[in-house]
Amino acid sequence: QDLLIDLNDVERRITPNTKAVIPIHYCGNPCDMDRLIKMSEKNDFKIIEDAAHAFGSIYKGCKIGSFGHATCFSFDPIKVITCGEGGAVVLKDNDIAEKIRRKRILGINKDAWHRYNNERSWFYDVTTTGYRYHMSNINAAIGLVQLSKLDQFIARRRWICQQYDNAFKGLGCIHPLKINYDDVSPFMYIVRVPGKQIEFRSFLEEKGIGTGVHYIANHVHSLFKKYTTKEMPRTEKLWQEIVTLPLHCGLSNNDVQTVIKNVLAFERTAS
């Protein structure tokens, strides 16, 4: 009903070899972190939260980013706030944080104090393998301005989601996910349209309304097919039902009503 990680299934699959579990706060809706933390403590695995959708979401009074051993956020162009491109990792372990800092810029270690004082400012050392993942000052500046508007963005997105929820309640072939938006920073608005995904998307496209599918299941992509050893019937079924409706702060009230009107029009023709 909410497409979050099935913790009953996780519990069945934990073995002594389990090193980490990666819950996804899908659409910005937090997973059951209390239960997952208990499982982590009992079975000695790390929790790496995929919070790409959930910047600003709250779970039981605390911001997402407060729970797992590591939490990953995304600030790409379509997220709740953007830096143009980029993201952030929030960690509880200072040693891991330092390793990530070095890896984000080619494994280079440069003492910040010496740079500030211009002592041997030319000197650096490569201490580990690394990547070019550091953010530019321009991207960071964009992000800081966006951050100052976060509450405004979240409020607008919640309002749109609530308009959709109210309009689509009790429909026969279109089913919104069951999400309480009071503490959620909504990234996407998803409906399930069993057996009519393609028809629904085509209908809205003809009306000038763009939609998406978030996401095509990983195991059906060419790269990952060879690693799929078991059937995943629920995943297979769900990705062919879900449709993403427009949700962003550029939508006017009239735009929202246009989406609602046309979704209801499809419901009448399809029921």
Task: Show the residue positions of the predicted features.
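Short Pro/Gly-enriched coil loops immediately N-terminal to beta-strands
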Residues: I64-G68, C83, S136, K237-W239
